Amino acid sequence: MKMKKFVAVAMAGCLAASLAACGSTASSSAATDSAATAEEATEATATGTGFTVQLGPNPETLDPALNSAIDGANTIITIFEPLLLVNENNEVVGGQAESWEVSEDGLTWTFTMRDGLKWSDGSDLTAKDFEYSFKRLADPNTAAPYGQTVVGMIAGYAEATGNPDPATGEMTTEPDFDALQVEASEDGKTLTIHLSYPCSYFDKIAAFAAMSPVQQATVETNGDSWCTQPDTFICNGPYMISEWTPSERI
């Protein structure tokens, strides 16, 4: 199990002009606060307990399925881990999956999960969590902005999304996201995905932030608010959220 660390992500704005107009007292206070923040960040980095990243605006969402912005993605990639990762050499490597195989016809991808995977609350994470998360991406009720992009090539996608009319986009049948051909083994050790057509870059899709797993019980219990509070924010990456002050820091 990977050691969970707390994220200290500072959000800063360009306030120079405003501070100058506020007089020496405000400037002195701002400088003191800035120095204190910098000192804390430096100490955390030096001890190996954290790092500071300027993100920009407050993330609209930290739900991997719903995010479509860079500011959210920059945080998501530190607190979640998908099946695969792309390393510094632009090579696809194992993430939550230790290995993967592709059938000769390119239609079946099988991922073998690492042993001992855990959620940030200490509960077991298995291939079944990825099955749920991928089907959630296809569920029209989720309205995932990248849903079609990342799971649209998986067999059963049309049925999962209600066979939308090509001209109007209106659903013509009742959505059945269980029709999506993603299946976890009974022991949760392997995840098998059947595609409608060969997709040679599906390994890179499997490394996309939107393909990160979410914990079913947490999402279903808390609804959309699950990813807005540290006490309900369950993740699986190397870092976890301990504090979120909107428009200030995470």
PLM features: residue spans?
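Sec-dependent N-terminal signal peptides of Gram-positive bacterial secreted proteins and lipoproteins
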Residues: 3-24
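Bacterial lipoprotein signal-peptidase II cleavage site
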Residues: 22-34
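Immediate post-signal peptide segment of exported/extracytoplasmic ligand-binding proteins
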Residues: 35-52
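Short, well-ordered beta-strand elements
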Residues: 47-57, 108-111, 130-133, 191-193, ...
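N-terminal lobe/hinge region of extracytoplasmic solute-binding protein
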Residues: 54-104, 234-235
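Aromatic- and charge-enriched surface segment that lines or borders ligand/interaction sites
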Residues: 98-149, 192
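Surface-exposed binding/hinge segments that line
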Residues: 131, 145-217
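Gly/Pro-rich hinge or "lid" segments in bacterial periplasmic/extracellular proteins
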Residues: 177, 195-250
